[in-house]
Amino acid sequence: MSMFLDTAKISVQAGRGGDGMVAFRREKYVPNGGPWGGDGGKGGSVIFRVDEGLRTLMDFRYNRKFKAKSGEKGMTKGMHGRGAEDLIVFVPQGTTVRDAETGKVITDLVEHGQEVVIAKGGRGGRGNIRFATPRNPAPEIAENGEPGEERQLELELKILADVGLVGFPSVGKSTLLSVVSSAKPKIGAYHFTTIVPNLGMVRTKSGDSFAMADLPGLIEGASQGIGLGTQFLRHIERTRVILHVIDMSASEGRDPYEDYVSINNELETYNLRLMERPQIIVANKMDMPEAQENLKAFKKKLAAQYDEFDDLPMIFPISSLAHQGLENLLEATAELLAKTDEFLLYDEADLVDEEAYYGFAETEKDFEITRDDDATWVLSGEKLERLFVMTNMERDESIMKFARQLRGMGVDEALRERGAKDGDPVRIGKFEFEFVD
């Protein structure tokens, strides 16, 4: 089984905030001794951190649930509960994080040490010392801790490489990478010897350096899933320059120009933006018989597809095995990289709106009202539900406070407008109570 994994589905859950405490101190002439209950500690957040030492998402094959710890409860003497530590989850460079429900991109992690809060820990509930007022100097009110965020995520790794080698199987991509870098890809005289991407650092004689990726061979229909399909096409997306390697000896019995057209069609079908990347045509195996004649025919067919004044793609005849023509190829690649900016990987439409994602959207509705088949009024909404779960329903004062909050939000008035009558059942989550008009 391959130890390379570039996709994963996981769930993350931040820690719940600790509950606030109801407590009183003993003090003469102070009702109930005065409030003394402290706040709960914050729940731990789930944070993704980039580790450049990781190369795959293999760690997520069997470990798919990540849960941060909850904060401690508030204590007497007004002391706060201890906040929980954040849970750090390490991911490789080039990891894209998507919301599994919407498919939107939450973040794209590309820099070593980069950190992003993926699920925010809940805040601690306030203790009764926070609710003391001149009218109520000894409140029996404390909040429950806020639940931590919970999310279903899709992770996708797209390796970071400046240059990507593409081409049919057995055209010499792995050999080229092994010759120009210290990478040691598997090389064999059969198709799909390379079944995972290989990455190597290339340094030219003039001192320029860049990362080069050897990607598994493509065949016609790859964008529809034939062969290794689109499994590794995603890794081309981060490259700025594509080296299109072609077996100019036609040792497999295919026409080199037809190979060139087929691979470009697959790239275009998979992602139209891949064709925006500049290409250098690498005419490999030029030390083989008939390679020179095939190259002449290739150039003629290629020129026929361009207007007289168009710039044709650069073509570099090489032999990876014989180490011929490599210096010129690498220097030209470095020069092309120097004048090629990074390509936008995601449009704004692909990205999660941060304000909406973290619950700060101005358009967020406080509540919604629906009616079940059993005639029960059902209240829902992120803000309302957050207030509800933080209310200690075991204490009368907390319940009365929650009722005042509902009135302040306009829930009572909205229920009346919808036709609610005195005594009608109303439900929030699993909690049910009667409407009082």
UniProtKB/Swiss-Prot annotation:
Residues bound to GTP: 167-174, 192-196, 214-217, 284-287, 319-321
Keywords of the record: Cytoplasm, GTP-binding, Hydrolase, Magnesium, Metal-binding, Nucleotide-binding
Highest taxon, organism lineage: Bacteria
Any Gene Ontology CC annotation: cytoplasm
Gene3D superfamilies in alphabetical order: GTP-binding protein OBG, C-terminal domain (3.30.300.350), GTP1/OBG domain (2.70.210.12), P-loop containing nucleotide triphosphate hydrolases (3.40.50.300)
UniProt-listed PROSITE patterns: G_OBG (PS51710), GTP1_OBG (PS00905), OBG (PS51883), OCT (PS51881)
Its EC number(s): 3.6.5.-
PANTHER family to which the protein is assigned, alphabetical: DEVELOPMENTALLY REGULATED GTP-BINDING PROTEIN-RELATED (PTHR11702), MITOCHONDRIAL RIBOSOME-ASSOCIATED GTPASE 2 (PTHR11702:SF31)
Summary of subunit composition and partner proteins: Monomer.
Entry similarity comment: Belongs to the TRAFAC class OBG-HflX-like GTPase superfamily. OBG GTPase family.
Designated name of the protein: GTPase Obg
Gene: obg
